[in-house]
């Protein structure tokens, strides 16, 4: 988590003139198989840290596939050349044939 905050601070220092800072934070822990103990806590912690850095944060907790897709679509629709956007995900993910996939709770 400290590494992420360091990266975020560096990113922000490069974007001090951006008009708006928005973030999408997704925390998935309530999986039927192999639940994650800390993913939701991590998402909540990063949300608090980003809000202290003047980000307008959308926190999505324990999202199924539809909710994740909708949240990502809505987030991307808010981005423009004057916006600093940050995406953070805590939950299961896999890599398949060199592509990374985020795993919803269902």
Model-based region annotation:
Residues 4-16:
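Sec-dependent N-terminal signal peptides
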Residues 18-19, 78-82, 94-96:
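Extracellular/periplasmic catalytic domains that process cell-envelope and extracellular macromolecules
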Residues 19-25:
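Cleaved targeting-peptide boundary
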Residues 30-44:
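Glycine- and acidic-residue-enriched helix-capping/strand-helix junction motifs
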Residues 38-41, 67, 92-106:
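A short, glycine/acidic-enriched catalytic loop
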Residues 43, 47-83:
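Functional beta-strand-loop-alpha-helix junction segments that form "active/interaction loops"
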């Amino acid at each position: 988590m400290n590494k992420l905050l360091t990266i975020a601070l560096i990113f922000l220092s490069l974007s001090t003139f951006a008009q708006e800072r928005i973030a999408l934070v997704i925390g998935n822990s309530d999986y039927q198989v192999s639940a994650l103990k800390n993913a939701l806590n991590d998402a909540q912690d990063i949300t608090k840290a980003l809000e202290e850095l003047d980000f307008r944060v959308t926190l999505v907790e324990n999202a199924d596939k539809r909710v994740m897709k909708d949240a990502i679509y809505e987030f991307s629709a808010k981005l423009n050349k004057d916006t600093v956007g940050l995406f953070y995900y805590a939950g299961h993910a896999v890599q398949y044939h060199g592509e990374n996939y985020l795993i919803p709770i269902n």
